[in-house]
């Protein structure tokens, strides 16, 4: 693909990258042939396994949506595949798909789309998801159901998809905004992290003929996604990371595999004095050789035209008539904690299952006051699908609504989240399993029959209108007015609340003050959204530092109980409301919820 050099590469990679670009074929003598004369814009080429066809994203006119097209390798017989489902980008061929309900397998393709206009977990814009369809454009199916961008799909030799995915928002500050490599089956099942080590942002993966996973990485996400080149081994992706290029080598984009174990990649200098040209890179030595460069254009997304082995076919258990999926865990105590003694058996009492609701709602039509979300508070609403006991051996087995973004939180005796995960999901009829809670992905578990799978799955599939939410305006503020104001209405109070704090402005000011930053970068003075156990407000409510040994806030120092002995003590339900509110993101306003539905002790799960 070539793109005129005077164009500025835009940050909106999905809609603006490739605007006005053209597809060209470069011959060995460096002569070129344009293949996309009938298109205003064409980009994202993908070569078929037999090298006879090419998929690409194109726009006939500037006002068109991006759609997926296929043509013969010589540019003839152009046909549109997607139509009327929004902007579609980044196509790639899949291998054969087999199902138990179809007498014949079929070929599919993967693409990226914002067809459903689902907002991300910041509420900032539509989320890009992976989709699949047959080569004739029928049987369009969504594959990813998290609330963050998914992009750059690449088909691996075993038939799974490798792609880049952004970690969920601010409930885990260490991962917030990172883009890592993930793997998934071509039917959307078994979503799992593939490679994380290296720099913060990893994009544009490909795999060489010798089993080297190549990707672009950077610590600062540039407007075009460019960076250095890193790699990991296909056979040990979690433990074999190494950098191939260094910063002084320039900026790189869109690596693709060659038949001789090398890669094609676009490169330019970091000072913006030139345009991208296409180079051959030897991953073992880092040696670069210029292949093609048109000085007036950015030359990117180069793909060599040669036949290659077709990936393994895949089967699928997904049955769309089944509205639910299952999720089981063998042992929540298998984890990545540095010291296993930090979480002895018996620490985890229950499991809370949260649903991510991508659309932003507000009770009674009220609006969230401008500026109240401080950049670390997630915008997406969370609803409680259920809360259940964990088996004595650390296992659980639940049935959840299919194709629904969920977050798991393991809870201690006080109902505080100890560990949590990013957005995951189960497809229709999928029996999804996990070994532990952030376990080592290279290790296999002990071969034991865990207790939870000897019983039917616990159903956590209440109708949406019966799923409980917790928010500040409706649930927390009434407790503050009832139990806290008697001490905090004094002029010398550290956190002062006026006696007449009843207007929306008063309530908004209290909420904003609870989210105020601490004295050090990243610190919070009162609450950490998503982590009740490390929030000083919770320490005072429980009269002790509730942090755990793996938290940097862990301390045995005495904490003053609030309300004090002479005050009106909070009930267990009132304490639990504060805990749930913070663990679920400390949102200002929630989804409308009649009488908050059920009590804190019954969250939709059935317990044996």
For the regions a protein language model found, what residue spans apply to each?
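Sequence signature of WD/YWTD-type beta-propeller architectures
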Residues: 1-393, 399, 418-433, 444
């Amino acid at each position: 693909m070539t793109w005129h050099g005077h164009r500025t590469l835009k940050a909106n990679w999905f809609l603006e990258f490739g605007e006005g670009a053209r597809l060209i074929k470069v011959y060995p003598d460096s002569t070129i042939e344009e293949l996309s004369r009938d298109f205003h814009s064409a980009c994202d080429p993908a070569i078929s396994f037999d090298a006879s066809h090419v998929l690409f994203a194109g726009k006939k006119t500037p006002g068109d949506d991006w759609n997926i097209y296929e043509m013969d390798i010589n540019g003839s017989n152009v046909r549109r595949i997607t139509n009327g489902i929004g902007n579609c980008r980044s196509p790639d061929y899949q291998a054969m798909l087999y199902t138990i309900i179809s007498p014949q397998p079929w070929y599919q393709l993967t693409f990226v789309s914002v067809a459903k206009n689902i907002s991300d977990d910041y509420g900032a814009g539509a989320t890009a998801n992976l989709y699949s369809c047959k080569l004739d454009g029928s049987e369009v199916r969504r594959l990813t159901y998290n609330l963050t961008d998914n992009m750059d799909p690449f088909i691996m030799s075993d038939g799974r998809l490798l792609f880049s995915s952004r970690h969920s928002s601010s409930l885990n500050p260490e991962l917030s905004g990172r883009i890592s490599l993930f793997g998934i089956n071509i039917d959307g099942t078994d979503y799992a992290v593939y490679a994380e080590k290296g720099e913060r942002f990893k994009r544009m993966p490909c795999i060489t003929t010798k089993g080297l996973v190549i990707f672009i990485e950077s610590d600062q996400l540039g407007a075009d996604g460019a960076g250095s080149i890193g790699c990991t081994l296909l056979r040990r992706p979690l433990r074999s990371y190494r950098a191939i290029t260094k910063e002084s080598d320039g900026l790189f984009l869109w690596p693709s595999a060659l038949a001789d174990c090398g890669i094609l990649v676009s490169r330019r200098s970091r000072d913006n004095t030139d345009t991208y040209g296409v180079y051959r890179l030897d991953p073992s030595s880092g040696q670069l050789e210029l292949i093609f460069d048109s000085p007036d254009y950015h030359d990117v997304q180069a793909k060599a035209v040669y036949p290659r082995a077709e990936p393994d076919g895949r089967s699928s258990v997904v049955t769309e008539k089944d509205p639910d999926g299952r999720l089981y865990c063998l042992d929540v105590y298998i984890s990545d904690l540095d010291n296993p003694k930090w979480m002895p058996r018996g620490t985890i009492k229950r499991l809370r299952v949260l649903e991510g609701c991508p659309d932003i709602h507000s009770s009674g039509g009220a609006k969230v006051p401008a500026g109240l979300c401080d950049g670390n508070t997630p915008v997406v609403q969370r609803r409680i699908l259920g809360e259940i006991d964990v088996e004595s051996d650390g296992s659980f087995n639940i049935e959840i609504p299919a194709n629904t973004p969920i977050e798991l939180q393991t809870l201690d005796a006080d109902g505080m989240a100890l560990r949590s995960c990013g957005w995951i999901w189960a497809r229709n009829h999928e029996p999804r399993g996990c070994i532990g809670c952030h376990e080592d992905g290279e290790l296999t578990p002990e071969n034991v029959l865990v207790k939870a799978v000897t019983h039917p799955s616990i159903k956590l599939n209440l109708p949406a209108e019966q799923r409980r939410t917790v928010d500040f305006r409706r649930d927390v503020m009434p407790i503050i007015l009832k139990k806290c104001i008697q001490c905090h209405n004094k002029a010398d109070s550290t956190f002062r609340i006026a006696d007449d704090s009843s207007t929306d402005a008063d309530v908004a000011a209290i909420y904003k003050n609870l989210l105020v930053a601490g004295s050090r970068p990243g610190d919070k003075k009162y609450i950490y959204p998503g982590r009740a156990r490390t929030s000083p407000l919770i320490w005072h409510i429980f009269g002790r530092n509730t942090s755990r040994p793996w938290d940097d806030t862990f301390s045995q120092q005495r904490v003053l109980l609030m309300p004090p002995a002479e005050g009106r003590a909070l009930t267990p339900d009132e304490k639990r409301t504060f805990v749930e509110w913070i663990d679920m993101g400390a949102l200002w306003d929630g989804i409308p919820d009649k009488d908050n539905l059920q009590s804190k002790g019954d969250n939709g799960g059935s317990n044996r």
